[in-house]
Amino acid sequence: MHYPSLYTFAAPDHWRAAPLFTTSCEAFLASFKVWNSATAGGNICMSLPAGPMITMTVALEATYTLWAADGSERTVDAADFVTGNHENILGPGEILRRVNIPISALRKRHTHRRFTLTQLGRSTLFMIATQSADMTDLLLTVTAGTTKPVRFSFDSMPDAETLQQSIDAIPEAVWFDDPNGTPDHRRHLAKHYAEEIRIELSAGVRS
């Protein structure tokens, strides 16, 4: 699907997390020409840390169907597809054929945080959190600041210390280092935003 189609997609009202389509499209840094011709699948397969379609699909618990040259298919969790900066699990001749987002994920509450050095700059950190309608669990996805997506799943809302420890447990080698941010800066942002998200969703703010 091209970005303009996803950006303007009219989702059913009960897809509470559908605004993340627009949010993620807006996080895609490109020229007008590229933005209007780029595809969600292409962004995923480029497998760059700041790929917003990676962020969105991992946060929405998507699966990818991969199609091999011999016609065989395999289905993988979106969270397992990207393995590093510009690296993924695609084999020779294999393509991304389909992205499937479960309806159950689209019905969840959501919030996000994104940091850039400039207003229209590349993401230094992009985090999305979702929560079931009963407002007890938490699914937190960390991207852009890491070389591959990191997704935390909590059956119940964690306390502040547990959440901070989870961020600290991300291996040093996974934090991305480039002119948009050092690993220490990105870790600091992740811990700060994680606590903001925890407070927001714990308060029962509807989204």
Kindly give the residue locations of the regions a language model identified.
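C-terminal structural segment of proteins
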Residues: 1-207
